[in-house]
Every structure is written in structure tokens, then in C-alpha cells.
Amino acid sequence: MTDRKVALISGVTGQDGAYLAELLLDEGYIVHGIKRRSSSFNTQRIEHIYQERHDPEARFFLHYGDMTDSTNLLRIVQQTQPHEIYNLAAQSHVQVSFETPEYTANADAIGTLRMLEAIRILGLIHRTRFYQASTSELYGLAQEIPQNEKTPFYPRSPYAAAKLYAYWIVVNYREAYGMHASNGILFNHESPLRGETFVTRKITRAAAAISLGKQEVLYLGNLDAQRDWGHAREYVRGMWMMCQQDRPGDYVLATGVTTSVRTFVEWAFEETGMTIEWVGEGIEERGIDAATGKCVVAVDPRYFRPTEVDLLLGDATKARQVLGWRHETSVRDLACEMVREDLSYLRGTRQ
């Protein structure tokens, strides 16, 4: 056990944290995860890999923590002495960041600084490698298409602004202290583990529910927003690859293919056997079930962002050339996988 690498994951109960923990355990790591104390259980994504800590074979351990508590983070890093830290924890919902901008900055921006400072204060600069979950939202009002590691940033939300600070403080600690610290600028990545407040999961869950008669209408904001969507399982492998390099760096992970929310909706409903036809314009536009004539998709202005990000498209050339990373799952296959999982869940047949 003592010869195994040790990893610490903040945000372990989220989509990426769950897939990453699974990957690291498969690679032979001892994995420590940080989870927040919550009023409801939020560990369902990792229950299948959790082991009782008294089990002599246990390699996965959970610690209560919070990115807003520096002494807590310092204690966890000191206790675990990780070879690699994956900082995935964040208030990661763009719309919510407009409602909780101060908390978002505290957790996402200063939280990253707290983790870096823990490494520095504990004298782990030459032992611990650091991965920071950056985001394509940094590009915001995109200055060029596609976006790569050299594209100027133009954040358009409190979330993106907080992540911009986190990005640059990682670069600063890398240059100032020689820390092996890397930013993964990940474009949108989804999966059946995606939270239901995110648009892709909202769409697939609604398509499944409507097809089963459990929901009437799916309400969305900007149907023409375009995103570069990939599969989260493939993206967490890219995170791990960054920490295996001799030299740290910043990498875009993306598919290089853009898809509109509208098209994602059509694919999701197609997987349930429904065909969507669009009528009307602007906020009056509706998606109609071609077979029944019923409205199943409608626009709700409340879901429009105060400052919209219309088009994000990533260029992952550097990741392909340096890391050997590639995406494999098409966005259509991803949408279908998510719908099938939601159908199984709603029917009560999910394993």
C-alpha cells in the first residue's frame, strides 16, 4: 500500500470527481475525496466505489471539507500527503453565479488559492502535482473561433470571472514557486452523471419523462446557443494525463464540434421515438411533437443569462500532440446514452 500513489480530489461527489476517482482507483491509486456537509445525501455518484475505511483493502476515503475554509484544507492536505491534487470543487452553475457572485468568487477563485497555499505552506511543492479545473466559459465573448490555449479570455459571468482568477493564480504559483500546476481548460462535458440543473441533463431527463407521460413541457432559454460537448469520462482521463507529464502546462480539452441546444433537444427526443417540429419565433417559439401536435418544448425568458455566451468551440491540438489525448464519443451518441439512462431511471429499471 505504501508504494501506491496518493491522490486528493476536491469535488469528488460531482460528475467529474466520480469518474476521476474511478479512473485513479483503476490505476492503482489511494484516493482521498473532499465532500461538503450537506442537508441531503449527495454521494450517490460514488457509492459504487466507496469502501468502509476499516476495510484493510480500502483505497478510497472521504473527508468533510469546504473550499471556503483554509484551515480545513490545510489539515486535509497535511493528513493525506498527496502526490496529485485534482481541484474540481466549485460553484459551477453559470446562472447561479449571477445570484451568488460573492460565494462563487470565494469558493472558485479564493478556494483555488487556499489549496495552492496549503501545498506551499506544507513544503509539498516538489512532491504534489496540482490540476485545476478551468473552463471554456473563460472565453465568454469569444475573440476567435475556435478557441485554443492562446485565445484571449473574455469572461461573461461571475463564475467565469472567478475561474479566470483561479487560472492565473495557478500560472503564477507555477512560475513563482516551480510548482507542477496545470490548468485544464475543459469545454462542456456531459454524461449520465451530469447534474439535473445543467442544460443537457435537463433536456434528456425531460425527453424521457415526457415520452413516459411523467412531464408535460420542457422549458429552456436560448435554443440557438452553441456548445462543444464531449463525454466526461474521456475528459477526466485528460486531467490525469496532464499530471503525468514531466512539465506542467495548460491544455484545452474539446471535441472541435459545435452543436446547438436546439439540435441536442431534437436528438434527445428522437431517442424516445418522438420527432420535434419547431413553430413560432423568439420567445414564442415552441417544439411540437409531430405525432400528437402537442407542445413539448417552450422558451422561458427566465432562463436567458444576463450576458449570453453564444458560441464556444475548442481546438485541442496541443492536448492531442503533447498528451496523446483524443475524444471518442460523438455528441449525438452522448445524448442518446443520457436519454437511455434517464428512461431506465424513470421506469425503475436502472441497475
From Swiss-Prot:
Single biological process term from Gene Ontology: 'de novo' GDP-L-fucose biosynthetic process
Pfam families (alphabetical): GDP_Man_Dehyd (PF16363)
Annotated SUPFAM superfamilies: NAD(P)-binding Rossmann-fold domains
GO molecular function, one term: GDP-mannose 4,6-dehydratase activity
Catalytic activity: GDP-alpha-D-mannose = GDP-4-dehydro-alpha-D-rhamnose + H2O
Positions with a binding annotation for NADP(+): 11-16, 66-67, 88-92, 103, 163, 189, 194
The protein's annotated pathway: Nucleotide-sugar biosynthesis; GDP-L-fucose biosynthesis via de novo pathway; GDP-L-fucose from GDP-alpha-D-mannose: step 1/2
Enzyme active site: 135, 137, 159
TM stretches of this protein: none
Keyword terms of this UniProt record: Lyase, NADP, Nodulation, Plasmid
EC numbers: 4.2.1.47
Top-level lineage group: Bacteria
Cofactors that this protein relies on: NADP(+)
UniProt record similarity statement: Belongs to the NAD(P)-dependent epimerase/dehydratase family. GDP-mannose 4,6-dehydratase subfamily.
HAMAP family membership: GDP_Man_dehydratase
Function of the protein: Catalyzes the conversion of GDP-D-mannose to GDP-4-dehydro-6-deoxy-D-mannose.
Name the record gives this protein: GDP-mannose 4,6-dehydratase
Source organism: Sinorhizobium fredii (strain HH103)
